Amino acid sequence: MMKIVIYHSNECDPKRCTSIKLQKQNKVAITHNMRKIPYNAIVLDAEADKAVSREDREKITKYGLSALDCSWKKLKKSSFNFKSKKNHRLLPFLVAANPVNYGKPCILSSAEALSAALYIVGYKDEARDLMNSFKWGPHFITLNENLLEAYSEAKNSTEIVEVQNEFLGGK
């Protein structure tokens, strides 16, 4: 599997933290040092301007995928420190299946976000493998399957946004 590195800000409940669980299963690496995030990795960032898409697959394969694990309530403050990396990507509209934010649009756990990004770029088996680490995990894929499939067929960020807007009733 490609390299997945999570910058962990220690703002969440360790017992419920999806990143810590994935690390215990050797599926991701956790760092508390920004410099440990691979330089050209795709960085999932809820404040990014560009959506993750199939065109990011090569970079993820070569350099890895990274995410910021922080409290949604402290996102602005935590993500400010995260801005030094360059390949920031936003996830399109998806619905959370984790027990903390179940049914909430766009408020995904780190594991859900990583899984969604992998699915969208075409690493569907790897996405399912991450979600299989949680009792509720497979339901995330099922709940969002139509959207994830449509997003994975989009060629680039622009098409991802078009799929999202069509789903949400926009143009």
Swiss-Prot record:
The keyword Transferase applies. It holds the Pfam family Fer4_RLI. It is found in: Cytoplasm. It catalyses: an N(1)-methylpseudouridine in rRNA + S-adenosyl-L-methionine = N(1)-methyl-N(3)-[(3S)-3-amino-3-carboxypropyl]pseudouridine in rRNA + S-methyl-5'-thioadenosine + H(+). It is an enzyme of class 2 (transferase). Keywords: Cytoplasm, Ribosome biogenesis, rRNA processing, S-adenosyl-L-methionine, Transferase. This is 16S rRNA aminocarboxypropyltransferase. GO terms for cellular component: cytoplasm. It comes from Methanosphaera stadtmanae (strain ATCC 43021 / DSM 3091 / JCM 11832 / MCB-3). InterPro entries: RNaseL-inhib-like_metal-bd_dom (IPR007209), Tsr3-like (IPR022968), Tsr3_C (IPR007177). Belongs to the TDD superfamily. TSR3 family. GO terms for molecular function: 18S rRNA aminocarboxypropyltransferase activity; S-adenosyl-L-methionine binding.
